Amino acid sequence: MLQRASTAMDMKLEHVGKAALAGALAVGLAAAPAQALTKSQLNELSYLQVKGTGLANRCPEVVGEGSISPKSGQKLVDMCIEPKAFAVEEEIGRAGKTEKKFVNAKVMTRQTYTLDGIEGTLDVSGGSIVFNEKEGIDYAATTVQLPGGERVPFLFTVKDLVAKGSGGAFKPGFQMGGDFNTPSYRTGLFLDPKGRGGTTGYDMAVALPGLQSGVEGDEELFKENNKTFDITTGRIEMEVNKVNVEEQEIGGVFVATQLGDTDMGSKVPKKVLTKGIFYARVD
């Protein structure tokens, strides 16, 4: 049975603010990566020139350090969000104590994990800028691997993002951040290896039907049968470090936290941390 719940799981997201963004800058995310191209340079390339190069998974570079003062009703368009580093929160045992710590992970997904074509409205009032995400390629199924070999799937996304920043202009040092929704990694039409799904498939696996009802306390089997569509909450913080006034472009770095896959309600999700760069154009 498909269950929607906008607050299906409570998240205690670690505060990601200026310190995290400073860390992203310290590891060189703000620097122009090798082979980075501007939007105009990318537009000049043909399909065959882009094919197989990985450029389609890259965000454009912004050149300049000016200032753009948007007005209410304008939009941010062509937004691109490219993760450069991934980490997963794990429990680390040391000296008889257990602590939670983010462990660096390796991305296993081929070059299809960058969000692109995102757009949304801008609201400028009271000395602040608010960005409301509306549409675009705003989610990407991604899998990362921990040092021990465990793989963690998650839906990299910024769906329904509402990001707010203090100030009336996009300029180097401008920061904005907010919460977004993270839909389920799987949809209701997905069938597990035993043919069970959220909106289709079997209600339960064969054998031991009495235990699978949950009545007799077999919670693990019940969760495997009772598929849910969990919507959780993530958070992203962004800092502008490049502004091209002539092209009305902004670029910078971001740090985001969100929950990973719940396997449709049958397992506890892991917290995933992503760091990278972003690009957008004021329209």
Q: For the regions a protein language model found, what residue spans apply to each?
A:
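An extracellular/secretory-lumen and virion-surface interaction module
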Residues: G28-D283
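N-terminal chloroplast transit peptides
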Residues: M1-Q35
